[in-house]
């Protein structure tokens, strides 16, 4: 089994567990690359995105040294918490995807919790 297949299997395993515990809560989905990090609050029942944020946004891009460090992830976590709260979402289910809960993913999650999201 190659790296791509194992990554996809890991992501599917995580999402399967999320579906079991989610209930009516939307999903806070994280995607990271070597240069940026992206996050969305997704309502799977309706099939649409409630809020989104990434390190590619112009107002953040100037203030961050790079989009690929824990400081950038923390800034995105605070921003998504602010946007989700503004949209009326307080509780979410954290979807780390195929990524381990460490480093940038952990920094984003902790900042989102500090910003007011509950998961």
Curated annotation (Swiss-Prot):
Keywords: Ribonucleoprotein, Ribosomal protein, RNA-binding, rRNA-binding
Disulphide bonds in the chain: none
Record's keyword annotation contains RNA-binding: yes
Pfam families: Ribosomal_L18p (PF00861)
Keyword Magnesium part of the UniProt annotation: no
MF GO annotations: 5S rRNA binding; structural constituent of ribosome
Listed InterPro entries: Ribosomal_uL18_bac-type (IPR004389), Ribosomal_uL18_bac/euk (IPR005484)
Gene Ontology CC: cytosolic large ribosomal subunit
GO biological process, one term: translation
Family statement drawn from the similarity comment of this UniProt entry: Belongs to the universal ribosomal protein uL18 family.
Purpose of the protein: This is one of the proteins that bind and probably mediate the attachment of the 5S RNA into the large ribosomal subunit, where it forms part of the central protuberance.
NCBIfam families reported for this sequence: L18_bact (TIGR00060)
Quaternary organization: Part of the 50S ribosomal subunit; part of the 5S rRNA/L5/L18/L25 subcomplex. Contacts the 5S and 23S rRNAs.
Protein name: Large ribosomal subunit protein uL18
Natural source organism: Mesorhizobium japonicum (strain LMG 29417 / CECT 9101 / MAFF 303099)
Source taxonomy: Bacteria, Pseudomonadati, Pseudomonadota, Alphaproteobacteria, Hyphomicrobiales
Gene assigned in the entry: rplR
């Amino acid at each position: 089994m190659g790296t791509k297949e194992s990554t996809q299997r890991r992501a599917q395993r995580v999402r399967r567990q999320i579906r079991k515990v989610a209930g009516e809560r939307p999903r806070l989905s994280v995607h990271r690359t070597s240069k940026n990090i992206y996050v969305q609050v997704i309502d799977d029942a309706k099939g649409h995105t409630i809020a989104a944020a990434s390190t590619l946004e112009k107002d953040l891009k100037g203030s961050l040294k790079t989009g690929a460090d824990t400081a950038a992830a923390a800034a995105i976590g605070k921003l998504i918490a602010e946007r989700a709260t503004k949209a009326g979402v307080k509780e979410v289910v954290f979807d780390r995807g195929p990524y381990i809960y460490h480093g940038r993913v952990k920094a984003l999650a902790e900042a989102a919790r500090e910003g007011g999201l509950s998961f």
